[in-house]
Amino acid sequence: MVTPISDMLRLWTIDSGEEKKESGTDRDLIPLATPLMASGYTPSGMEFLTDKMKDFNMVPYSAASAGIDEVPRPLEAGGAVSATLVTGDLKLGAVGTVTYVDKDHMVAFGHPFLDKGSSSYFMHNSYIFTVVPSRNIPFKLGSVGAEIGTVNEDRGSGISGLSGKVPESVRLHSSVLDEDTGRTQSLNVRMVQNERMLPMLSVTSVYNNMSNTLDRNGEGTVSLSYTLFPEDLKKRPFTRSNMYWSSKDISERSVDEMYNVIRILEQNRFEPYKLRDISVDMKVTKDRKTAQLLDASASPTVVSPGDTIYVRARLAPYRGEVFYKDLAFTVPKDQPLGTMILEVRGGGVVPLPYLIQQQKYNLTDEILERIRTYKDFNDLFDKLEKEDKNNQVVVEILDPNVSMISRDEENGTKAEIQDKRPSQNPDYLKGKKGDGKEGEKEEDSPKSSVDTDYVVYGDGQFTFQVMAPEDRDRALRKLAKSNQKMIADMKNEGKDSISGKDKDGKKEETKEENGKKPDTDKKSGTSYFLMSDSMTRL
């Protein structure tokens, strides 16, 4: 297929409005995968990049650099040029032949690159090593050289560019510390300002820096923090930190969250959130820094709206010593009287009752994301930034309709799946108030959290009775009397306990001697629960 030069030269007139319609191109043809030249990527970085590029119908090839790559050269017809997506410590772009040059303007390729119309890619010199034959489509294998301008049009007849003009871009700085070796690596790149491609370009760059620093694959724990700076200085930067453990590929696991956050913010339906800078800092170790939530206790068990519940969680690190974390949870002032169920969990854990309901309705993560509603951009922004962290212990109210605790139980020592009548949406997608209608903000469920130095797994629930203040005081006085009687009984039995005999002279056999744990004392005013199996949120 030969593209007439007249069609290509029309690309220069599109900005002025003199020519809006192209001819001589066939939009019904099936697009072939676009080959890209990549330099600066590690072998595992190339594998990751190749996998992510499939969604964009692109195939990256590792390309060596030529000795003259970093020296800017004027373009000339018949020479090579690159339309580039990433530049800096990494380079990623498509190379092709320059068709015509007029001063600082040029047209090239004779076919589309991404076919995005008016665009803003980096324009680079290029050096072509050879032409790779292929039954599908032969392509030029070359290097991406020095930056010289902007590719401003990308249409069916080819690309056009302007030398000396700097395109819009997003800067990314990534710093990775390998705590095992003490090695630190930094990476600086600029990426095209394209809201659909930016999430992929960002995480493949960060992944490559992680791969380059660790120089290994496999398990590890990463502590990361990142900030997204918007182009509009009136908008708030997005800052978040988190912690991840992976037994397979910590490099890939470490960039999952950032990919989703950038995608959601850049592609949100409310208002533009164009980025100008991304800063990422990571600390990685091969050690497994995880902790299992064993159990928890809370007091008091009888409360009124506005009261404070004190929770102590017991956790066991992987091959480490058990430790405790204390939290205070305030009962909402508008909490209905009756049974209230609290969930204690790791910050990245999906409670088992919710997971069961998700499976019951056959809801995928994509469906869940579509069901969730937000009032406006600020609501979306705040929810993303305040999302629970994997290294937190979280206490929150659990919907009683999906709890695994029997309503007949006075404390949380037993787990039982509740029957539930089907509804249109699972209850865990509904806020405390509001019906999820468009434009109506759903209130977040009250919660409390505390940070740890570990990725926390496990969850469980226990119940509390919410009463009016006068009823609460009466119930607490009754509990206090029961406690006093219990203490007196223990003192009276103390002498017999020393001899190991009961009142009839027979030796007592405790539940611990039988290999059983003593039952929780329901009169103590402290509630305990057993842990349920759960699933870590991906």
Residue spans for each PLM region:
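Terminal presequence/propeptide segments associated with secretion/organelle targeting
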Residues: 1-538
